[in-house]
Amino acid sequence: MGNRALRYRIYPNTAQMEQILKTVGSCRFVYNDALTAKESAYKESKTVLTAHDLIRRLPELKKQYPWLKEADSIALQQSLRHLGTAYANFFNPKLHAKRPKYKTKRKSRWSYTTVMTNNNIRIGENHIILPKLGRVKAVISREIPEGWNLKSTTVCVERDYSVYVSCLFEYADISVSYIPDPALSIGLDYKSDGLYVDSSGRCCGSPKYFRKAQKRLTKAQRGLRHKKYGSRNYRKQNQRVARIHRHTANQRRDFLHKESVMIAKSYDIVCIENLDMTAIAKRDSGLGKASLDNGWGMFVSFLEYKLRDRGKLLIRTDRYFASSQTCSCCMNINPKVKDLKVRKWTCPTCGAVHDRDINAATNIKREGLRILSAIELDKVS
């Protein structure tokens, strides 16, 4: 079974918007209360409270705080399950997740998740029916494929008070009888001041949407600084700032979707490096903002599921593979070109002249095909 989410814009009326914000606040309160209870129980008696233990505390908590009854009960339970997942991720050494912390109204995401039970969530042509909200006007921008079963929905309020619903569907995996052709393979080398350079020499530059919006954003944030916090004018100006951020994020997401679908349609095997983007963004190279603006991680996630749906392959090479230092002609390793400032170099062994990025992409492609061959040999043996 596979999972896929579809995101729709909804337009709640005043009463529905008030109910959404109440539910978001209630989920935040329950989450913080459970975090306190969980930490206290462990400190006092070394007892580990599970998500199920925390959910059993909800009836008592509702008696103590009657306003919690106004929120969707399933959403409150889901917030406690999210806390359990956060702790599981924290104790998983492979994920390197941070310790769960308290949610705040100013910094935390305004969202809640509710689960499909007894057909309580329904999607129509121009509306969505949600628990505690009823019929909400929506823009159903994409039809639901046959055989997709709705599992849950997440209602998210952006900082400019636009509201979206992410609907999670479950569907049966259909085995695609497609054999990837190694001749239709390509290597992609990450480019900090762009997006990538491929093994054919094509350079995909980043539109740098955040940098283009920075002047307007600075002006809007400067106006926010002169408003009294909590006032009506402060909220209006804060929405202007949030709209700029949302527009920039939407532009970036749209560009990455188009770029990833173009590659997924054109190639059968795509080889990339398994990069630690957090470390790259923090590196003292002056390219931290550019690395975050180009959205490489989002691009890879889009590319991965688009290739998988078509029966194609995404292969990751080891992050310590010397793709830039290896001559793609004679395979000699030249450690002198490890410095990122060296953009063009000549191989001291065979005399081949290389562009740093194209050479790296070619080596990534070759290494990816080698990994694929090794996997196929293991299957045969």
Label each region the model flagged:
Residues M1-S381:
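Nucleic-acid substrate recognition interfaces
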